[in-house]
Structures are given as structure tokens and as C-alpha cells.
Amino acid sequence: MKELTVQELYDLNETIAGELFEGVTYPWEVLPKIGEFIVKLGNTLPEDEYEKKGENIWIAKSAKVAPSAYINGPAIIGKDAEIRHCAFIRGNALVGEGAVVGNSTELKNVVLFNKVQVPHYNYVGDSVLGFKSHMGAGSITSNVKSDKTLATVST
């Protein structure tokens, strides 16, 4: 399963969460660590670049957040990111630099690398999206199959 490793899938220079991936082989191994990591990292972010808004929410001063967007912590919104109308960030979300979280898009327990685009009616849960990933309108990532059976990965 070499092609499914963090080393093969991601450019860790394109996220402020590089440290989160240290010591793991597969991307899903970081999922239970995202919230704690965000709190740790958030408390070290430079105050001249990030503003703390509420409990465990850090938003880059250069980011654009629509007034109708909802952000629950822990969350970090990176530099030049755009959080659009009615976006719903449920927590444990790290949104990379220049990323777009679109209208009516929902995030939960995610790392979005720099310049990721989830622009239209997406659900991104328990996921890691790499540099410049783009999800088409209405796309869903989730850790639960509709029939509740385990997912099997084969190569």
C-alpha cells in the first residue's frame, strides 16, 4: 500500500500541519489527533497574522469570512483563505492558505492543505485533502458508508 502513504500522497511543505503527520504512515492515522493539534498550533500562531476569535478559533487577518459562515472550534483558517456564504465548520478543521470553503459546505475533523477548493455544497468529514485538491459540486467525503459496513482498501 505504498501509494497510499503520506509520503506518496502529500507535499508537507504545503500545510502548516506538517508536524501532525510526523510518525504516521497513512493519512487516516492523523484523524483522531486533529483537534488537539489545532489547539497546540493555534496558541503559537503570530498575533500580528492571526486573530483569536472565540474558543480555539484562529483566523488569519488576510482571510475572508462571510458574515453568514459559522465556525466552531477548534479551527484554524489560513492566510488568504476564503470562507463563503453559509459555510459550516463544525470543528477540528484546519483550512490551509488560499483555500476556499464554499457556500453551504460543511467541514468536520479535516485538514485542508494550501489552495484546496471545496467550493459548492460539499461535505468534507474525517478527511485530509492535499495541495490544490478540488472537490466538484455536491461531493461528499465521509468515514461512514451508507450500509454501515467497513470499507476495504485493496491495491
Spans of features found by a protein language model:
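Terminal amphipathic alpha-helical/low-complexity segments used for targeting or macromolecular assembly
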Residues: 1-56, 61
